[in-house]
């Protein structure tokens, strides 16, 4: 965590909004996360603004009851997996003779961002420069980790972007702003939940694939050399597995799954576990070809709570080794959000402070000062 690294001791409220549940806690405090059933939000879209607003209020009031410090004025970070998310890669080149300076790097990042905004007309939820190349004085194009100070005729950068439809984001943002105002919370920020989780895991793991199985979809995030290499949205979620079980005659999938996998029972309501496992395996196998066998898989999402037997079943269906199961994601998500802010100057990540129309540098300075207690 940030405090253990000596990087600050600030606190912030973090809320993870999903289609099945909404979770929240105060990061940097030993506060047990509060979790409630979701409402008004399905498949990454707002379906009932009033209901979602009520649910967020219920969650925040629940957090305030278990956190003794008071939530008024705390910065709040919402993490969410939006529907209609588009993942793109974009490349730009600028002249940089005689050598690459910090100004060149800043200019090409801004060029990447502005080009994507102008072409796609969508909100940029996340952005990272994943590759730099220089054209050296011998006209050789070379990939480099950090181009600053190198002699080069030109600098090329490739960025990875997560884009969200403007209408989808604005509907969501208006609800969050109302909730923020009602509970007198501090500054507000929005991040992608799977990216935040992957960034939090980078502190403990190197190259890996994060398999984040949500209620209506699965997000597969590949991390290579500390950077995001892939981000895929797969049409498989808990609801699809539940529907498959219902089709097999299992009327209460939630209870049955919890009982069979967590308690390791042989029989539940006259259901043969092998029949249940066979149905789940068929659904999980649909995404097996999307996962590389070269890197360990980290498993997260609601099904991560079902215990060792589900992990074994998942490994069998995917043909991949599950190296870690994330049963408590809030710590990793909070760590990931913090890490992305601190790495901004190094890897090109640009956080999105959508609630305030101010400069990017101003947003970063605010987070460092107010959230993390770091003075320049």
Residue ranges and their predicted role:
Residues 44-46, 161-189, 225-265:
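Glycine-rich phosphate-binding loop plus the immediately following alpha-helix
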Residues 48-56, 269-280, 329-334:
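Phosphate/oxyanion-binding active-site loops and adjacent basic polyanion-contact surfaces
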Residues 81, 223, 300-302, 325-328, ...:
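Generic beta-strand/beta-sheet core signal
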Residues 203-230:
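Phosphate-binding/catalytic loop of phosphoryl-transfer enzymes
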Residues 222, 230-232, 242-245, 307-311, ...:
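Extended hydrophobic-aromatic, low-complexity segments
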Residues 248-251, 257-298, 303-304:
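Adenine-nucleotide phosphate-binding core of ATP-dependent small-molecule kinases
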């Amino acid at each position: 965590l940030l405090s253990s690294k000596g990087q600050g001791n600030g606190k912030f409220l973090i809320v993870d909004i999903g289609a099945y549940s909404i979770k929240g806690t105060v990061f940097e405090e030993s506060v047990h996360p509060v979790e409630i059933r979701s409402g008004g939000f399905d498949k990454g879209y707002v379906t009932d603004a009033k209901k979602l607003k009520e649910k967020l209020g219920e969650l925040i009031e629940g957090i305030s009851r278990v956190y003794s410090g008071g939530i008024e004025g705390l910065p709040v970070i919402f993490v969410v997996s939006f529907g209609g998310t588009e993942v793109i890669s974009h490349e730009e080149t600028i002249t940089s003779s005689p050598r690459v300076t910090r100004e060149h790097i800043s200019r090409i990042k801004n060029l990447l961002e502005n080009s994507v905004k102008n072409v796609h007309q969508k909100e940029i939820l996340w952005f990272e420069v994943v590759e730099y190349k220089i054209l050296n004085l011998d006209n050789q194009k070379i990939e480099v980790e950090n181009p600053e100070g190198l002699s080069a005729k030109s600098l090329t950068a490739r960025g990875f972007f997560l884009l969200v439809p403007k209408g989808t984001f604005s509907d969501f943002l208006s609800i969050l702003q109302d909730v923020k105002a009602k509970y007198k919370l501090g500054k507000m920020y929005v991040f992608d939940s799977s990216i935040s989780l992957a960034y939090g895991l980078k502190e403990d793991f190197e190259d890996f694939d994060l398999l984040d199985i949500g209620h209506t979809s699965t997000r597969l995030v590949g991390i290579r050399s500390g950077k995001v290499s892939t981000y895929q949205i797969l049409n498989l979620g808990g609801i699809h597995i539940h529907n498959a079980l219902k089709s097999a005659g299992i009327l209460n999938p939630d209870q049955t799954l919890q009982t069979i996998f967590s308690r390791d029972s042989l029989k539940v309501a006259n259901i043969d576990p092998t029949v249940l496992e066979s149905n789940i395996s068929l659904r999980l196998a649909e995404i097996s070809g999307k996962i590389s066998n070269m890197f360990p898989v980290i498993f997260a999402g609601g099904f991560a709570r079902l215990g060792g037997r589900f992990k074994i079943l998942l490994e069998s269906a995917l043909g991949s080794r599950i190296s870690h199961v994330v049963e408590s994601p809030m710590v990793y998500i909070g760590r990931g959000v913090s890490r992305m802010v601190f790495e901004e100057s190094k890897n090109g990540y640009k956080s999105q402070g959508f609630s305030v129309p101010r400069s990017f540098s101003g947003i970063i300075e605010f987070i460092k000062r107010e959230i993390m207690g770091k003075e320049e």
